[in-house]
């Protein structure tokens, strides 16, 4: 009798845990697993075990594994594409200041998560439907940058090439895992601005860039270390 009561209590506790789990809980775990272990390890049974719930509770939130995959891609698009578009559209006094605004995405991983981006690209190599989503996202990002250059008077073809250069350079660094020491990387900032825009940054631009690096890169890291 006591044993059956204990089992009933455990079952009720498990059901309570499952009821408290949200769609976002499953999605967060799926994205974390994608980044750490790849898409093959994004399995319903494995995730249910990590969450300490029954496999069936997954279906309270998603119709299928494919529905989860779709939600993962939607989340990636929201996290890694929308901020680029917003920064590219943000008003600025000149093109150098506009590009510094875009640099915020490369400095702040809450605006652009490079590990998630690379994980999705690896997934895309194995799934044509994912590759189509990635290709479309790349096109949207480049087009936002192209329109940014157009606003500052660049000819159409030059605006496209500069947009591609700005975007492909950064994605290429992530793909190659070319992670220099921050001090070294940031020391090249003014030169990158010159290459990307064809214009020399002045003291005002250098101060803007330094402020951006401090606020978006160093300050958040110091805050995390102080906790």
Question: What does each model-identified segment do?
Answer:
Residues 152-213:
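Hydrophobic/aromatic-rich alpha-helical bundle segments in the mid-to-C-terminal region
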Residues 113-118, 128-165:
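Amphipathic alpha-helical packing segments from all-alpha helical-bundle domains
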Residues 25, 33-71:
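Helix-turn-helix
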Residues 1-21, 202-227:
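N-terminal intrinsically disordered/low-complexity leader segments
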Residues 2-13, 89-107, 139, 200-203:
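Alpha-helical bundle regulatory/interaction domains
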């Amino acid at each position: 009798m006591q044993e059956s009561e204990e089992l009933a209590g455990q079952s009720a506790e498990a059901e309570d845990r499952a009821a408290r789990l949200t769609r976002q809980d499953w999605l967060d775990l799926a994205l974390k697993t994608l980044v750490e272990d790849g898409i093959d390890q994004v399995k319903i049974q494995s995730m249910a075990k990590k969450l300490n719930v029954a496999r069936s509770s997954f279906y309270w939130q998603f119709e299928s594994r494919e529905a989860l995959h779709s939600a993962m891609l939607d989340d990636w698009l929201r996290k890694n594409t929308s901020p680029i578009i917003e920064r590219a559209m943000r008003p600025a006094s000149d093109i150098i200041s506009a590009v510094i605004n875009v640099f915020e995405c490369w400095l702040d991983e809450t605006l652009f998560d490079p590990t998630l981006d690379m994980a999705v690209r690896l997934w895309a190599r194995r799934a044509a439907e994912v590759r189509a989503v990635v290709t479309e996202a790349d096109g949207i990002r480049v087009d936002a940058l192209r329109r940014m250059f157009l606003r500052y008077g660049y000819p159409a073809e030059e605006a496209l090439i500069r947009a591609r250069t700005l975007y492909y350079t950064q994605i290429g660094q992530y793909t190659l895992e070319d992670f220099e020491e921050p001090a070294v990387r940031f020391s090249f900032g003014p030169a990158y601005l010159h290459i990307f825009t064809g214009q020399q940054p002045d003291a005002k631009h250098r101060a803007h860039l330094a402020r951006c690096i401090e606020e978006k890169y160093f300050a958040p890291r110091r805050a995390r270390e102080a906790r």
